[in-house]
């Protein structure tokens, strides 16, 4: 279960929800098994070598092409979310848009996020921290909004509906400012009670 058991610190709960929602966990498990296999070939980029070795192995055992592509992609990209979340400006929308282009599905993004978590948390006790988790989660959310087709236009359509549902209880300006500070998905999924 990737160390995401029942008694979980609050900073890991979002990752647990991602894991629980995966449609094909076995693809993540294969990526976890294969992600560092390219290290056996010294002197080369282990992510690229690992992708090639993974593709060859998974084709040989007869997995469907779609699955082979997903797992090979995860192996190739297994360092990218860690690198981007810790070394790039997550407020750079162009960078997020460019990063999002490589994902065919939201499922591939979810699996890459979980692979990144597992890879970092499995290295040493100090490789993972709540801060790194927050950065990784922020990158995931911003990228998922692009991959899933969420954009400013959708947020602009969702916010008035939420404001209308809350206008009796909370001033419009307060609700709007709060919703615009949250991920776009929040305004689309949460309704006033």
Predicted regions located by residue number:
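Acidic/histidine-rich catalytic neighborhood
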Residues: 59-117
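Composition- and surface-driven signal marking solvent-exposed, interaction-prone regions
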Residues: 9-14, 43-52, 68-73, 86-87, ...
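Acidic/His-rich, divalent-metal-binding segments that scaffold phosphate/diphosphate chemistry
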Residues: 1-52, 56, 62
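Short, well-ordered loop/turn and helix-capping segments at boundaries between secondary-structure elements
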Residues: 39, 43, 56-63, 77-85, ...
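Feature representing long, continuous alpha-helical segments
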Residues: 28-35, 48-56, 69, 73, ...
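Short leucine-rich amphipathic alpha-helices used at interfaces
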Residues: 10, 16, 38-39, 45-46, ...
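Regulatory modules associated with amino-acid/nitrogen control
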Residues: 94, 98-193
């Amino acid at each position: 279960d990737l160390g995401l058991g029942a008694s979980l610190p609050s900073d890991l709960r979002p990752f647990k929800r991602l894991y629980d929602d995966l449609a094909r966990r076995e693809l993540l498990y294969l990526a976890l098994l294969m992600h560092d296999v390219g290290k056996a070939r010294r002197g080369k980029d282990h992510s690229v070598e690992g992708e090639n070795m993974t593709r060859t192995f998974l084709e040989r055992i007869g997995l469907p092409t779609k699955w082979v592509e997903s797992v090979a992609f995860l192996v190739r990209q297994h360092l990218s979310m860690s690198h981007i979340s810790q070394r790039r400006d997550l407020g750079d929308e162009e960078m997020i848009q460019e990063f999002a282009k490589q994902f065919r599905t939201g499922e591939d993004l979810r699996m890459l996020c979980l692979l990144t978590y597992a890879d970092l948390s499995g290295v040493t006790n100090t490789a993972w921290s709540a801060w790194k988790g927050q950065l990784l989660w922020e990158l995931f959310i911003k990228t998922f909004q692009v991959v899933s087709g969420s954009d400013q236009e959708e947020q602009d359509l969702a916010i008035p509906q939420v404001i209308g549902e809350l206008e009796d209880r909370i001033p419009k300006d307060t609700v709007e400012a709060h919703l615009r500070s949250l991920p776009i998905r929040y305004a689309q999924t949460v309704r006033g009670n």
